[in-house]
Swiss-Prot record:
Cell compartment(s), UniProt: Nucleus
Organism of origin: Xenopus laevis
Protein name: Homeobox protein Hox-A1
Disulfide bonds: none
Motif Antp-type hexapeptide: chain residues: 109-114
Alphabetized UniProt keyword annotations: Developmental protein, DNA-binding, Homeobox, Nucleus, Transcription, Transcription regulation
Residue ranges of DNA binding: 134-193
Role this protein plays: Sequence-specific transcription factor. Part of a developmental regulatory system that provides cells with specific positional identities on the anterior-posterior axis. Acts on the anterior body structures. Seems to act in the maintenance and/or generation of hindbrain segments.
Keyword DNA-binding: yes
SMART domains named among the record's database cross-references: HOX
GO MF annotations, alphabetized: DNA-binding transcription factor activity, RNA polymerase II-specific; RNA polymerase II cis-regulatory region sequence-specific DNA binding
């Protein structure tokens, strides 16, 4: 019991509890609760002061920037709005102005609006073929050619093919040009007679000359062929 009490009192109470356990724990708590708290609180205080100074500097600079750049910015925005409003007003005046509606100005003619026409070509010998071919331009006759054609029309209202070839060679024309001119001249003659400007001639009242002209053209153009009556008679004589 003595040994146990002495061991417990000497070792446990004096050495362990008061010497090792009690004092170092309080010292550690004091150190941990005193110095770090004071340092941390000091840091907080200094940071708060710095933050307040920085915030006041920012507010002052922002206040300075607002006063220095605010009126100019507002002025530029106002000028932009005024320019846009004046532009819209000018466009409306141009589109809905009464002067442009009542008295339009001279319109400009562009190249794509112009109509292109081919100039008339002068007829030459051998340039145009027979009648019925496409893209046949109107022939511009000379004064000499018209005079000779009028002379021939005065004597002969209808031409044979041989006479037409002769006149075309003499006037440097082709047969089709001479034929068309005579057809148009006969139509013009009939129109004047119907209107009462010219007396009715016996040659133009009948179409026998025109039919004879067509028959002469067909006989000259087609080759000679035996008649069907002669061919049948020859066939019967050969068989008999």
């Amino acid at each position: 019991a003595y040994a146990h009490s002495s061991c417990g009192s000497n070792y446990g109470m004096q050495n362990f509890s008061p010497g090792y356990s009690h004092f170092p724990i309080h010292q550690e708590t004091e150190v941990s609760s005193g110095f770090p708290q004071s340092v941390y609180s000091g840091n907080i205080a200094s940071s708060v002061v710095q933050h307040q100074q920085h915030q006041s500097y920012i507010e002052g600079s922002a206040h300075y920037i607002h006063h220095s750049y605010g009126p100019e910015q507002n002025l530029s925005v106002a000028n932009y709005n005024n320019n846009v409003a004046s532009l819209h007003i000018s466009q409306r005046e141009v589109c809905h102005s009464p002067s442009s509606e009542t008295s339009p100005g001279p319109t400009q003619t562009f190249d794509w609006m112009k109509v292109k026409r081919n100039p008339p070509k002068t007829g030459k010998a051998g340039e145009y073929g027979y009648a019925g071919q496409p893209n046949t331009a109107r022939t511009n006759f000379t004064t000499k050619q018209l005079t000779e054609l009028e002379k021939e029309f005065h004597f002969n209202k209808y031409l044979t093919r041989a006479r037409r070839v002769e006149i075309a060679a003499a006037l440097q024309l082709n047969e089709t040009q001479v034929k068309i001119w005579f057809q148009n001249r006969r139509m013009k003659q009939k129109k004047r007679e119907k209107e009462g400007l010219l007396p009715i001639s016996p040659s133009t009242s009948t179409g026998s000359d025109e039919k004879s002209e067509e028959l002469s053209e067909k006989s000259n153009s087609s080759p000679c062929a035996p008649s069907p009556a002669s061919s049948t008679s020859d066939h019967l004589s050969a068989s008999g």
